[in-house]
A protein has these predicted regions:
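A short interface-forming secondary-structure element
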Residues: 50-69
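N-terminal presequence-like segments and adjacent domain-start helices
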Residues: 1-21
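Long, highly charged amphipathic alpha-helices
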Residues: 14-21, 70, 74-78
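A short amphipathic beta-strand at an alpha->beta junction
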Residues: 76-102
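Short edge beta-strands and adjacent turn/loop segments
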Residues: 30-56, 94
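Extracytoplasmic glycan-interaction modules
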Residues: 2, 6, 29, 45
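N-terminal targeting leaders
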Residues: 16-17, 28, 58, 68
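Short secondary-structure junctions
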Residues: 23-35, 82-88
């Protein structure tokens, strides 16, 4: 794997911090939420950022869907606090059954 530049390391640290905070909140507030993982392409940051909340079952996922917009807003607010503006918050956070390896 190619070594990350200083800018890419900062971007990764920023996203990891936000993802960890949101994951901790979500585990407390959303039953059935297993983990939070993310994917992004550094050369397209922040537009390529995709944060995923993984759920243990279809029932837990369906029960959590009404909360999706609230969590998208939380992600957007957390990124703004870090100095990153997400133009369309709905594109950057999804609820899924898939894990990072799927």
């Amino acid at each position: 794997m190619k070594k990350l530049s200083k800018v890419q390391e900062k971007q990764q640290a920023l996203v990891l911090d936000v993802a960890d905070r949101l994951e901790a909140q979500a585990r407390e507030e959303i039953p059935g939420m297993l983990q939070c993982w993310f994917d992004m392409e550094f050369h397209l940051f922040p537009s390529s950022l995709l944060l995923c909340f993984q759920f243990e079952s279809e029932q837990a996922l369906e029960a959590a869907k009404p909360e999706l917009l609230k969590w998208q807003k939380r992600l957007s607010a957390a990124m703004v606090k870090k100095g990153v503006i997400l133009k369309d918050m709905r594109k950057h956070l999804v609820f899924t059954l898939n894990g990072p390896e799927d």
